[in-house]
């Protein structure tokens, strides 16, 4: 609709986070650009959850909002296979149940073999600030109209969702000295498995808190809040509530944490993470000035809530193609998700599968045991969603296999088989695999003398050695790392110095957790037996013994495999057994 806002970050100027960082690395492993752009434009990097096990470690970058969009535009324009056209699409060209192109607001018909809808929050979007309603897709941009009405007419089930964004403030008016400082990691990490530059300097974020006075001021606007008066019909994100929602739901809390995040290198604009609101702007402003550090704050623009249309993702195949209209794909918030990362993953998968569809090839489907992207799409297609869906590590039952450090070894070989240009990434995967073999062999074969390691063991609260022991056995102890051996044993340091730090880190995780990883892989093998049993178009009403709910859900969703069927809400183990008997015939 507007080429000047391509890749504009609508909300938080950040990429990654818990489970989201894993998705960004998976996109990169599959040949996507998200991680590359993030590495080139971030102002701070942090690895979250380092106090927990490696399955929970999640990279997060604070981004330069303006540079992020600029870098994306440059990369897209550098691709000769991408064409651009600035206009609003108001309808689809559909003939005999097959999409043939799109129709624009100027009346142009653009033919296409496949169409992917990635409408974000723009479908009949309405911004709410207090008692005011504004038709918009986001601040300063018009809403998209026409598509929802046509899709509903074609038989699609539509719904409304809501999200919000906080006020932006002038960083020059803040008292940074009274806030907690949050520095980035040293050494600095990155997202992409390609040769992107590492950040040489970082900008800090800050932390402050609301208080009782802030809450009292905010409450004075509740009678004008569209959320409490019923003007907002859409359901908001459970895990990213507005400040008024937090005060209402957690009335026993005297304060709520706020992250004060710079929007870039060369701007004074600041994003107040945790202060999302749709209250009248004067209430937002008055309350904000009671936050420590914000006593003299000037607001650039108030926070707002936005309502928009979405379509139940149970209307999609696992390829993200719609069941009702052939060659039509949905990706992003139109499917009920929230977040840049979830949307980017769906866009990549929809794009891959649209290409495969045109070329009469089987769709590319990632299993739950292969990627967070697989978990995301499987959840959406099989369970649907009644609220904006956000990815968490807890949603992935095989998360010890789906770590951020091994996204490349999991997915890059699959991307290569599809014909995606991942030559450099694949060469690095081979190098990483070879490094692991050498490191594992060295650690299993090297014996350590007590005198070389006992001091560090004592410092770590671990029992000293009685006799020399294989390095591998010592490494299995809690709080012991390869770096501990490098510090005290020159031959270990000399050997490890030939490898990249990331390769060493990945090898260490694989060695320390190899027992858990082996058990998880055995479990996956059992589950995959069901994933490999295909289900073709079946009238489930003809299968005796299935529950009425199972017949209804299976006929509606038409799962591709027994495994997919088993994850549909309402399908019992007894129903799965009946399906196995039926398919066996």
Predicted regions and their residues:
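A glycine-rich dinucleotide-binding beta-alpha-beta segment and adjacent secondary-structure elements
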Residues: 265, 271-337, 365-378, 500-553, ...
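Extended, charge-enriched "interface" segments that sit outside catalytic cores
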Residues: 395, 401, 412-577, 581-585
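Conserved N-terminal/central alpha/beta ligand/cofactor-binding core
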Residues: 1-91, 106, 118-135, 142, ...
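Core beta-strand elements of the Rossmann-like FAD/NAD(P) dinucleotide-binding domain
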Residues: 105-114
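An anion/pyrophosphate-binding glycine-rich loop and adjacent beta-alpha core
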Residues: 2-3, 20, 149-285, 293, ...
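Internal hydrophobic alpha-helix adjacent to the cofactor/substrate pocket in enzyme cavities
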Residues: 27, 343-364
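Glycine-rich phosphate/pyrophosphate-binding beta-alpha loops
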Residues: 333-341, 397-399
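Glycine-/small-residue-rich beta->alpha transition segments that form the dinucleotide
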Residues: 114, 119-123, 279-280, 292
